[in-house]
């Protein structure tokens, strides 16, 4: 459980200026519980444009739960499965969390999944919001979630989303496949260039 607000500004110079290394990855996903208890992590930097599963958490799965946490002033860059909080959520839950800051996905074509809260959702998200400035020249981008294949309830997005070149771009989600979104909305500004598919 988190007990104070955390100033993560120093992460900008970590790991040869690549910044924070996400908690959980494809070989060792995060499967535990993190309760922010209403506190924030401020100014975290993760500058990893050639890596996947980027965010505070990279890959969260197998019943894991992240709750009651704010991520503010984040600067995030990754290839695919990129989010302000979590890169990818799989059979896990996020509740009462929010993100602000900037995010960029560098993956090619539709393989760059990126969203203000998380890049790809195959779990459950409840009572969360995101206000991020999100951009990618290629990819599936959403103000809240990039690629949604799970459940989202009582959540919203603001901020702005900019995509181009064969991308799918949405104010709330970039792509929604056989998935449930309830009592949620977006006020994000969406800008599409070239032959992007806006929504």
Q: Where are these predicted regions, by residue range?
A:
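Surface-exposed repetitive/solenoidal architectures
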Residues: 1-199
């Amino acid at each position: 459980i988190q007990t104070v607000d955390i100033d993560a500004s120093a992460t900008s110079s970590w790991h040869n200026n690549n910044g924070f290394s996400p908690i959980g990855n494809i070989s060792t996903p995060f499967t535990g519980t993190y309760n922010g208890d209403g506190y924030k992590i401020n100014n975290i930097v993760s500058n990893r444009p050639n890596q996947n599963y980027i965010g505070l958490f990279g890959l969260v799965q197998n019943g894991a739960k992240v709750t009651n946490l704010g991520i503010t002033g984040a600067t995030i860059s990754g290839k695919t499965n990129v989010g302000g909080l979590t890169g990818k959520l799989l059979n896990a839950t996020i509740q009462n969390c929010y993100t602000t800051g900037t995010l960029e996905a560098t993956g090619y074509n539709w393989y760059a999944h990126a969203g203000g809260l998380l890049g790809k959702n195959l779990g459950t998200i409840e009572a969360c919001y995101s206000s991020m400035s999100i951009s990618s020249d290629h990819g599936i981008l959403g103000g809240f979630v990039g690629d949604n294949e799970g459940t989202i309830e009582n959540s919203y997005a603001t901020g702005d989303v900019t995509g181009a070149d064969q991308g799918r771009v949405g104010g709330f989600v970039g792509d929604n496949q056989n998935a449930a979104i309830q009592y949620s909305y977006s006020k994000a500004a969406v800008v599409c260039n070239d032959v992007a598919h806006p929504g």
